[in-house]
Curated annotation (Swiss-Prot):
It comes from the Bacteria. The keyword Hydrolase does not apply. It is a peripheral membrane protein. Could be involved in insertion of integral membrane proteins into the membrane. The keyword Isomerase does not apply. The lineage of its organism: Bacteria, Pseudomonadati, Pseudomonadota, Gammaproteobacteria, Enterobacterales. Its main location: membrane. It holds the Pfam family YidD. This is Putative membrane protein insertion efficiency factor. It comes from Escherichia coli O157:H7. GO terms for cellular component: plasma membrane.
Length: 85
């Protein structure tokens, strides 16, 4: 089970949601990655919190340019993702 979201994570997720609903439809689909950079950002903030989640999101957005091939780039597993072997 993931920890509850911090106020900072909630604010950043709300800002990403505003982007997804108001700005992204005007720009059209152009993200080179799966999941999209905004979806990646939300998942990273939920999984890692505001500091590491923001860092991962910034790194991802900086990779989203025409010279990068894109493709599948999921959020890394978080500290609360456990697997039984």
């Amino acid at each position: 089970m993931a920890p509850p979201l911090s106020p900072g994570s909630r604010v950043l997720i709300a800002l990403i949601r505003v982007y997804q609903r108001l700005i992204s439809p005007l720009l059209g689909p152009h993200c080179r990655f799966t999941p999209t950079c905004s979806s990646y950002g939300i998942e990273a903030l939920r999984r890692f919190g505001v500091i590491k989640g923001s860092w991962l999101t910034v790194k991802r957005v900086l990779k989203c340019h025409p010279l990068h091939p894109g493709g599948d780039d999921p959020v890394p597993p978080g500290p609360f993702n456990t697997r039984e072997h």
